[in-house]
């Protein structure tokens, strides 16, 4: 009987450890908010904004959602250091930014697939999808990063922008040196 109780206790302990480790490895999901909510939140608790500019028809956008943004290291880092915003580059959301109102006057709700480009997408200078746009604590555009980024590629930008390392780059070679010396820590 004692041997049975010991085995049962050991099984419970193993199950408990498994649950704890699973929660640590799985991390937290990114809490995506609207651009308006992020700008408002910055006033109370200044953090940079990471904006995922996507379209519904974009394959690499969907892949980035699945492979990059669901990566526990990426999700934890973004959740801790950024306000995360998803913005449909062809959607009909109204955006108020620096006393300007941006809309998508040619948006067609019936249209399947590609739609008209939102004015805010054009204002941000987005030329392809997905594009990650970084915005400072003060609401100023830092930089767009165009194209699919795997967790390690995105890690470079997340950390470089969070730490302000990009502000010392004075020529293109500076970024190349930074890239060459960067050692990613995020795992797949």
Residue ranges and their predicted role:
Residues 103-110, 118-133:
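Structural micro-motif
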Residues 45-59:
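Short active-site neighborhood of thiol/selenol oxidoreductases, capturing the structured segment around
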Residues 29-32, 71-112:
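Thiol-based oxidoreductase modules, predominantly thioredoxin-like and allied folds used
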Residues 45-49, 80-83, 127-129, 137-138:
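Loop/turn elements at helix/coil->beta-strand transitions in domains of secreted/extracellular proteins
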Residues 31-48, 78:
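A short beta-strand-turn-helix
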Residues 28, 43, 125, 136, ...:
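Non-globular targeting/processing and membrane-anchoring segments
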Residues 62-66:
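Detector for the c-type heme attachment site
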Residues 1-29:
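Bacterial Sec-dependent N-terminal signal peptides
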């Amino acid at each position: 009987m004692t041997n049975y109780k010991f085995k049962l206790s050991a099984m419970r302990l193993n199950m408990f450890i498994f649950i704890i480790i699973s929660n640590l490895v799985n991390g937290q999901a990114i809490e995506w908010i609207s651009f308006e909510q992020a700008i408002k939140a910055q006033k109370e608790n200044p953090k940079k904004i990471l904006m995922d500019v996507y379209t519904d028809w974009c394959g690499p956008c969907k892949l980035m959602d699945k492979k990059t943004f669901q990566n526990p290291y990426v999700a934890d880092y973004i959740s801790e250091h950024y306000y995360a915003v998803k913005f449909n580059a062809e959607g009909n959301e109204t955006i108020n930014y620096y006393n300007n109102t941006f809309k998508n006057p040619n948006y067609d709700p019936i249209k399947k697939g590609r739609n008209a480009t939102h004015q805010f997408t054009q204002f941000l200078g987005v030329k392809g999808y997905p594009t990650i746009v970084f915005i400072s604590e003060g609401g100023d555009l830092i930089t767009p990063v165009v194209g699919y980024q795997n967790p390690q590629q995105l890690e470079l930008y997340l950390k470089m922008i969070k730490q302000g390392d990009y502000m010392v780059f004075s020529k293109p070679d500076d970024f190349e040196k930074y890239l060459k010396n960067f050692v990613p820590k995020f795992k797949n």
